[in-house]
Amino acid sequence: MKSIFKSMSCLVLGAMIVTPMFAQQKKLYPELEGPGPVVIISKDKNGKEELINVFEETQRPHFHDPRAPRFLLTDQQGKFALGIGGYLKTTMEYDFNGIVDDVDFIPALIPQPGSTSVRNQFQMDASTSTIFLKLVGRTKHLGNFIVYTAGNFRGSGKTFELQNAYLSFLGFTMGYDTGLFMDLAAAPPTIDFQGPDGMTFYRATQLRYEANVMKGLKVGVGVEMPSVDGTPAQDVRIGKQRMPDIPAYVQYSWAKASHIRVGGILRSMTYEDQVNNKAKSLTGWGIQASGTARLGGFQLYGQYTYGRGIAQYLNDISNLNVDIVPLADESGRMQVLPMKGWYAGLQYNFSKRVFASATYSQSRLFTEDCYAHFNETQYKKGQYLVANVFWNVSHNLQVGAEYLHGWRENFNDVNREANRINLSAQSVSYTHLRAHETCADLV
């Protein structure tokens, strides 16, 4: 515990040191005042401001998503523009008094007792660096027309991996994107790419529809490509799925950067019972409440999720392959387990360029039908604590420091812990959030 308090004290002290430095910085770097430049390449500049507005209006709200691009290519009529952008991010990580077996801080991946004697670990990562192309336009019949593709280098061997590829118009979105059973604008800022262990986060090929039905009220519904991650079992095969996943939500916003959201998801998970040579299905479902609110210089974040058979949507539990699990003593049969995840966070803005946040999160897998008895070393509960400070040095550079502490508890009540310090430097486009803004401002 002493090491935790020392690390937290260092972060607070760092924030106190950085804050007064900003006043000096504005004198040294006057370019920080006012917006940065956008380079527009076009024979005709008519409509350029309108196109820039489309980019800003359709900005993705997640903290790790790139902001509006610096370079725009427009057509001669000024009706369409192609944006090219992204960022380069490098992170240094040091684990102590326990390690996590991944570049992301995932409590579920804290090694089992006796599996390693290593208690400290140093890593560096640049694989979350992102590039994107975004085509936007205002059309007479289709409204704002958006084509967006983005990717980073999280593929096998740090190869390029697609993160988004979708088309959007008139409220419809089709393609590959983050799922609808999540609230990107309510996610807290972290250097850690995965984020809180109890947060919902996933990507899927989908067709969705979202609409503002009245002032402050927004609804959405979709169909998503199913993917079932189950625990291997004798005489059971998990493969082809017969039904899409169906998510939906209702969201109410009462002010800029302040909203509450209630969502749900329904899924049918098919597996083959090879004992009886029969295809069977289990029903999974989840409910979620989330929100964010601004109170003076503070921004609050929170989310609570509960359901059955929704493991792949929860950050920590998605690593366990427990969407469906074997039913004890019954060959060829599977079951769905209850599970939950939640987090609560707070961000404070010291100045227009410096902000800090802290978040606590928890995820829990429950047992039924003697599952825990036959899986004593299986994950039961994970906890995740993060505190960080960010400094937007200029329009093109953001640096950050972060402390993380994680706990993993098994069904046999064996506990393990890990600690990590993250330091990051990230190049950013000119419209990257200032400290007094949050991702919630973008919805």
Label every model-predicted segment.
Residues 431-438:
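Conserved small/polar residues in nucleotide/adenosyl-binding loops
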Residues 95, 138, 152-156, 181-183, ...:
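Sequence/structural signature of outer-membrane beta-barrel proteins
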Residues 255-375:
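Detector for outer-membrane/organellar transmembrane beta-barrel domains
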Residues 75-104, 114-228, 242, 247, ...:
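Outer membrane beta-barrel
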Residues 1-26:
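Bacterial Sec-dependent N-terminal signal peptides
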